[in-house]
């Protein structure tokens, strides 16, 4: 996986939206999805068309400060969702997702081995930003609806659209 990964299941009072994009540095999208699923079982899910993203990164990092997700071809007119992150979770640290050399998914450690690791958030931010990041987030639509859910992202390699010129650079100050 290279480029940007962005995934956001969001729950509102009468529907949920599932948004997902994998985009390469050159703008190619091997994967994209945007669908609204209604709470009312008599309503069919709605395809929202090609989703568009506008992320603002924290200068010097690969961390998303805020986002705007747009669905220009939504059935009822353009749908815009403002994403306000509430909490970062660096899921690639301490979970077996790949940043821990001594503990990976499926790695045999011996019979009945149990390990633990406790770190403060400020200790892992500097390297955790290079893995997968989940944010608890508030989502607000241009129709006034407020919901909550997950905003997940990762940037691997360059992603020049947001000022990431190589695999390790952070976003420039704006």
Residue ranges and their predicted role:
Residues 1-174:
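Structured soluble/peripheral alpha/beta segments that form catalytic or ligand/cofactor-binding pockets
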